[in-house]
UniProtKB/Swiss-Prot annotation:
PROSITE patterns associated with the record: NR_LBD, NUCLEAR_REC_DBD_1, NUCLEAR_REC_DBD_2
Gene Ontology cellular component annotations, sorted alphabetically: cytoplasm; RNA polymerase II transcription regulator complex
Subunit structure: Homodimer (in vitro). Heterodimer with other retinoic acid receptor family members. Binds DNA preferentially as a RAR/RXR heterodimer. Interacts with NR1H3. Interacts with AKAP13.
NR C4-type zinc finger span: 205-225, 241-265
This protein's name: Retinoic acid receptor RXR-beta
Gly residues biased stretches: 320-329
Residues covered by region (Modulating): 1-204
């Protein structure tokens, strides 16, 4: 559209005063129209004169350097929402901009006063306050209140009071009144053990775990481990382990491997020199007395021998009846029946023999019954095995009956019969075991601390240790040329245990079948383990 075809309403609107300061766009239109009419006064002279007068009033003050460029811009140079040049600047008076309280105003949110290619607006004067956001400045300015941490925040806090509460006592990071009590489980804090802890009760043996009787040779131990260590040091004994030198040494298995038990004594801290000093003090007091002279006095071997001889005399009186030593004519042909009858008769004499063993009668009556029920089979097997030393290929029972090897095989008990002959009778014959040594071995079997139901196993263990010491002293005095005799005697104990268990299996089998007559006393012994359980 050319300027000549301009609609005639523009001069009337300008003449009516509608081009006042209501907007940038209208002002621009008025300025252009006034200049256009000045060039063409033939269109409307009156309107041109009024427009010239109005334009002269607005251009009377001297324009600033940046306003000339703004007057010549198009529609894109100004925003219709921008304030007029006559309106005051709110930021120059210190008022905050229209932004949410407490949030910083990003630079992009400031009003743009200049377009592309235009010079930047003049810098605003600095605000009167320290920060244009009074809410944030007031909260940051108070040193006593730290900013609240968001939920789940675990990072460091810059408040000195919080730092003082986190620091441990003694760190010097805050006044004592700011230090809070530490929470349980903080590393570095030492909490005393409760008064009812493990150290408050009775101590246990460091070697086998049994009840300790005090500190012996530098270590809390029971009487059994104390005597074992003392005997090993005084006699300078050497042991060997049949396994990998890692046997279990506890209350029930401490007697199975002497090597591992001795090594554990040394590992827990038992001192060899303490035993030697004790032995030296004993020599100083007793003069020429032996170092182990107290052990035979506590468990004299002569009393053990008397018990063996007394039981043997009663057995011989019974043998002189019908049949004698070879009396197979008046006895049943079944060897199993003969063995069961002989065992039943020997059980009566076994009780009398046990009462003659030193210190056995001093035990509680219930413990005496438990010990007899636990070892009666091994005690009887050891007795008739030693009695059969002079018998060839057979055993001699307490009743005077002789059971041959062939008879045992025909009765179906040949395997266990052969073990008795090879592992017991033959070994006893080769080493010429006497009755004192037999009595000591049987006493060791009798004092079994591993029997179930004992009221005081430690006391039984002490008695067994005394028998060990007495037997060792006897072997060294009676057979000084045989250094390993004591060890050979002890090696018969595992064989007795194994054969005794196997014999019990056979007896239980015969009892279930019912073909073999079993007398009352033997039947009670066979039922004893079930009664104890």
């Amino acid at each position: 559209m050319s300027w000549a075809a301009r609609p005639p309403f523009l001069p009337q609107r300008h003449a009516a005063g509608q081009c006042g300061p209501v907007g940038v766009r209208k002002e621009m239109h008025c300025g252009v129209a006034s200049r256009w009419r000045r060039r063409r006064p033939w269109l409307d002279p009156a309107a041109a004169a009024a427009a010239a007068a109005a334009a002269g009033e607005q251009q009377t003050p001297e324009p600033e350097p940046g306003e000339a460029g703004r007057d010549g811009m198009g529609d894109s140079g100004r925003d219709s929402r921008s304030p007029d040049s006559s309106s005051p600047n709110p930021l120059s008076q210190g008022a905050p901009p229209p932004s949410p309280p407490g949030l910083p105003l990003p630079p992009s949110s400031a009003p743009t006063l200049g377009g592309s290619g235009a010079p930047p607006p003049p810098p605003m004067p600095p605000p009167q306050l320290g920060s244009p956001f009074p809410v944030i400045s007031s909260s940051m300015g108070s040193p006593g209140l730290p900013p609240p941490a968001p939920p789940g925040f675990s990072g460091p806090v810059s408040s000195p009071q919080i730092n003082s509460t986190v620091s441990l006592p003694g760190g010097g990071s805050g006044p004592p009144e700011d230090v809070k009590p530490p929470v349980l489980g903080v590393r570095g804090l030492h909490c005393p053990p409760p008064p009812g802890g493990p150290g408050a009760g009775k101590r246990l043996c460091a070697i086998c775990g049994d009840r300790s009787s005090g500190k012996h040779y530098g270590v809390y131990s029971c009487e059994g481990c104390k005597g074992f260590f003392k005997r090993t040091i005084r006699k300078d004994l050497t042991y060997s382990c049949r396994d990998n030198k890692d046997c279990t040494v506890d209350k029930r298995q401490r007697n199975r491997c002497q090597y591992c038990r001795y090594q554990k004594c040394l590992a827990t801290g038992m001192k060899r020199e303490a035993v030697q000093e004790e032995r030296q003090r004993g020599k100083d007091k007793d003069g020429d007395g032996e170092g182990a002279g107290g052990a035979p006095e506590e468990m004299p071997v002569d009393r053990i021998l008397e018990a063996e001889l007394a039981v043997e005399q009663k057995s011989d009186q019974g043998v002189e009846g019908p049949g004698g030593t070879g009396g197979s004519g008046s006895s049943p042909n079944d060897p199993v029946t003969n063995i069961c009858q002989a065992a039943d008769k020997q059980l009566f004499t076994l009780v009398e023999w046990a009462k003659r063993i030193p210190h056995f009668s001093s035990l509680p009556l219930d413990d005496q019954v438990i010990l007899l029920r636990a070892g009666w089979n091994e005690l009887l097997i050891a007795s008739f095995s030693h009695r059969s030393i002079d018998v060839r290929d057979g055993i001699l029972l307490a009743t005077g009956l002789h059971v041959h090897r062939n008879s045992a095989h025909s009765a179906g008990v040949g395997a266990i019969f052969d073990r008795v002959l090879t592992e017991l009778v033959s070994k006893m014959r080769d080493m010429r075991m006497d009755k004192t040594e037999l009595g000591c071995l049987r006493a060791i079997i009798l004092f079994n601390p591993d029997a179930k139901g004992l009221s005081n196993p430690s006391e039984v263990e002490v008695l067994r240790e005394k028998v060990y010491a007495s037997l060792e002293t006897y072997c060294k005095q009676k057979y000084p040329e045989q250094q390993g005799r004591f060890a050979k005697l002890l090696l018969r104990l595992p064989a007795l245990r194994s054969i005794g268990l196997k014999c019990l299996e056979h007896l239980f089998f015969f009892k279930l079948i019912g073909d073999t007559p079993i007398d009352t006393f033997l039947m009670e012994m066979l039922e004893a383990p079930h009664q104890l359980a």
